[in-house]
Amino acid sequence: MSFVAYEELIKEGDTAILSLGHGSMVAVRVQRGAQTQTRHGVLRHSVDLIGRPFGSKVTCSRGGWVYVLHPTPELWTVNLPHRTQILYSTDIALITMMLELRPGSVVCESGTGSGSVSHAIIRSIAPTGHLHTVEFHQQRADKAREEFQQHRVSQWVTVHTQDVCRSGFGVVHVADAVFLDIPSPWEAVGHAWDALKVEGGRFCSFSPCIEQVQRTCQALAAHGFTELSTLEVLPQVYNVRTVSLPLPDLGADDLEGNVGSDATPFRSGTPMKETVGHTGYLTFATKTPG
């Protein structure tokens, strides 16, 4: 199993995503002899998981069942163990597009955190690209290395343990894109410029506060970045349902005789009353050649 390439059968050591029902999932490490307790009963790894195809519908000990899904960066994002606040797929999708990531791209990232963005970047740049990710916290860096190894993507990522604001990314003039998710991104803008290729590249910074954005944009302009833009992703979910509205009473002028009768049912979409609010601002910029 790899987060980059699909494999048919579940093997020992794989990470599998158990779908327990609508909106309920859990990630498990498949180990021979291990068991996983679910609300549907016990799932025995040796019997119920190993050797079965991903996507199988598996019956648990109490008669309930789960679907065993192949891991993807999107599924990992909603099931990973949180070591820090993370970005979700809505923001990540825009980041990977605006950074123009593709197979073969070299990317510098800080901080690694829980690895949510890292997995999406690796999937975008494999099989010939590479990610240099910087995490100043030793335990988080060690855990990220362990997860990259378990998920069989370690060949596409190097984890650097250092303060990016003081020491940079550990590489110079190799990156096609730089992504920052740190408290003071303006302090790392100079290192981002140095890490990007001489012929240019793309920059992105995630910040929850507009004051951070202002200082980052000032630093970007001072270092020569161009095409500065800041975006906020606010998805609007619609609830689609079948409704039936009675025809209006038009009085004596209603020649059809349909006063008060029901109209033909139709499908209607209305915005959900509760939607996802502000997560953060995404600031993009370009390093131009020369």
From Swiss-Prot:
It is found in: Nucleus. Residues 20-22, 35-42, 64-65, 85-89, 110-117, 180-183, 205-212 are annotated as: Substrate. The modification N-acetylserine is found at S2. It catalyses: adenosine(58) in tRNA + S-adenosyl-L-methionine = N(1)-methyladenosine(58) in tRNA + S-adenosyl-L-homocysteine + H(+); an adenosine in mRNA + S-adenosyl-L-methionine = an N(1)-methyladenosine in mRNA + S-adenosyl-L-homocysteine + H(+). Transmembrane segments: none annotated. Its EC number is 2.1.1.220, 2.1.1.-. GO terms for cellular component: nucleus; tRNA (m1A) methyltransferase complex. It is an enzyme of class 2 (transferase). Pfam families: GCD14 (PF08704). One of its GO terms (biological process) is mRNA processing. InterPro entries: SAM-dependent_MTases_sf, TRM61_C, tRNA_MeTrfase_Gcd14. Keywords: Acetylation, Methyltransferase, Nucleus, S-adenosyl-L-methionine, Transferase, tRNA processing. SUPFAM superfamilies: S-adenosyl-L-methionine-dependent methyltransferases. Substrate binds at T279. Belongs to the class I-like SAM-binding methyltransferase superfamily. TRM61 family. Heterotetramer; composed of two copies of TRMT6 and two copies of TRMT61A. This is tRNA (adenine(58)-N(1))-methyltransferase catalytic subunit TRMT61A. It comes from Rattus norvegicus (Rat).
